[in-house]
């Protein structure tokens, strides 16, 4: 928390007197935590990764294990940071709906003993360095500065690659369309389950296409904008007009 790469994050805390307070803490982890019983009762299990999300990661990308949590809900398995992914196998926790829990909302077991299992002490990261670098890549590419965009993209991929030259090869094309697709892909995996994907899809104008292809047919073009509160429209005395189709 509050690392050198944190641009803006909401500060949260738990205390002995207020271990689970939404006044000094947040429900960020509780809402997304592993939903189970006993020691696996870590939250509500919302905002889960899909099979499509899992398939988006390139072979060997370490960000997959840092994003998607593979759990075998068993009260006989101890919880440690080391046994929350690969030892459980790479398959969804629920074969029925093909979803994965969000590892970025997985809390420190030692702190659970002190402050409850639901992670009210975890800060909420709003903007981080990787996001900003990919913003720069996207902006440069849309301005036709493809060489600059490629360099920004490689900064993110190189960091994820680490010392393993066999994964995440450099994107060498300077074609604007190819780079656009590569940058959009990189945002999906670098920022996976950090709550920005929907807004990216809307911003790119492809929300209907992508969501409908994933079976989320409830999304309609009007949902790109939120409805204006009627009270505010009334107070504006005709200045504000309701967004289309609301």
Q: Which positions does each model-derived feature cover?
A:
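Flexible, polar/acidic helix-loop-strand segments at domain edges
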Residues: 5, 57-129
């Amino acid at each position: 928390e509050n690392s050198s790469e944190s641009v803006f994050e909401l500060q949260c805390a738990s205390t002995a007197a207020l271990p689970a307070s939404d006044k000094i803490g947040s429900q960020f982890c509780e809402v997304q935590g592993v939903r189970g019983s006993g020691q696996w009762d870590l939250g509500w299990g919302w905002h889960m990764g899909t099979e499509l999300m899992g398939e988006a990661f390139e072979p060997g990308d370490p960000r997959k294990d840092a994003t998607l949590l593979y759990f075998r809900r068993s009260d006989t398995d101890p919880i440690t940071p080391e046994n929350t992914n690969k030892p459980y196998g790479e398959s969804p926790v629920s074969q029925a709906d093909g979803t994965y829990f969000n590892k970025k909302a997985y809390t420190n077991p030692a702190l659970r003993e002190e402050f409850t299992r639901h992670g009210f002490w975890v800060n909420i990261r709003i903007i981080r360095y990787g996001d900003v670098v990919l913003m720069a890549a996207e902006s440069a590419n849309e301005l036709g500065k493809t060489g600059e965009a490629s360099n920004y993209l490689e900064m993110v991929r190189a960091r994820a690659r680490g010392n393993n030259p066999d994964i995440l090869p450099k994107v060498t094309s300077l074609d604007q369309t190819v780079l656009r697709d590569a940058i959009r892909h990189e945002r999906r995996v670098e920022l996976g389950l950090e709550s920005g994907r929907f807004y990216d899809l809307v911003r790119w104008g492809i929300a209907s296409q992508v969501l409908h292809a994933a079976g989320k047919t409830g999304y309609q073009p009007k949902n790109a904008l939120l409805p204006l509160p009627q009270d505010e429209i009334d107070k504006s005395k005709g200045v504000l007009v309701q967004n289309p189709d609301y």
